[in-house]
Amino acid sequence: MRVVVSIGGSVLAPNLDARRVEDHAAVVETLAEAGYDIAAVVGGGGVARDYIGTARDLGANEVQLDQIGIDVTRINARLLIAALGSRVDPKVARDYEDAGDAVRRGDISIMGGIMPGQTTDAVAAALAEYVDADLLVYATSVDGVYDADPSSQDEAQKYTQLLPTELVDVVAPMSRDAGASAPVDLLAAKLIQRAGMRTIVLDGADPQHIESAVLDGEHNGTDIIPPDGKDDLATWVHAEQ
């Protein structure tokens, strides 16, 4: 079974905490040892936003700001690589071909951003499609997909299950609202829809949530299930193993 995990920068490295990085690396290694082909895409988080904000004040244009964000994601990716064992490709993958080659030869592949204008949410979805992954997991700072931004609206309701088309419909208005925060961005949602990719959005602060979702199909997040994916997640996971 082939799995792509997107780990938000604010989940992996909200501050420089070696133990947190080690805990996420341990889950990635556990999945690899269980026989899964694994790739992880790491975001930039608050550090990237801080650098981008300062660079914007200095007059950097949007492409330059994106490049700074990409650099930070790759630094975070290097942190995760440093915590992983001998099965990881020691280089941060710079494109989908590099990541795909590593996965197909049995290595764990780690990548950050790759091009201006594209978030690591979208990179993870595109990578999952490129390597023909069975499952895409978004480990975010939010415990699923809501009908509104839960950080600003107390009445926001969480979805336990969505079709890919419904995910696009939920995320699209958030992408238009200044200051709103969607758990995955609109481009990622559209890529998930195009690929018919089975996807989970969950709270990644505790990396054990990732392990439980992949190994046992158990989590408290949101399942994105393509139209032909009729089984519940636990049944589907065990059937795919």
UniProtKB/Swiss-Prot annotation:
Reaction equation(s) it catalyzes: UMP + ATP = UDP + ADP
Biological process according to GO: 'de novo' CTP biosynthetic process; UDP biosynthetic process
Record-linked SUPFAM superfamilies: Carbamate kinase-like (SSF53633)
Segments traversing the membrane: none
Residues reported to bind ATP: 9-10, 45, 49, 140, 146, 149
GO CC annotation, single: cytoplasm
Known regulation of activity: Inhibited by UTP.
EC number, UniProt record: 2.7.4.22
Keywords, in A-Z order: ATP-binding, Cytoplasm, Kinase, Nucleotide-binding, Pyrimidine biosynthesis, Transferase
Cited Pfam families: AA_kinase
Molecular function as annotated in GO: ATP binding; UMP kinase activity
Pathway connected to this protein: Pyrimidine metabolism; CTP biosynthesis via de novo pathway; UDP from UMP (UMPK route): step 1/1
Subcellular location as annotated: Cytoplasm
Residues annotated as binding UMP: 44, 66, 114-120
Main location: cytoplasm
InterPro entries: AceGlu_kinase-like_sf, Asp/Glu/Uridylate_kinase, Uridylate_kinase, Uridylate_kinase_arch/spir
Role played: Catalyzes the reversible phosphorylation of UMP to UDP.
Subunit structure: Homohexamer.
UniProt record similarity statement: Belongs to the UMP kinase family.
Name assigned to this protein: Uridylate kinase
Gene: pyrH
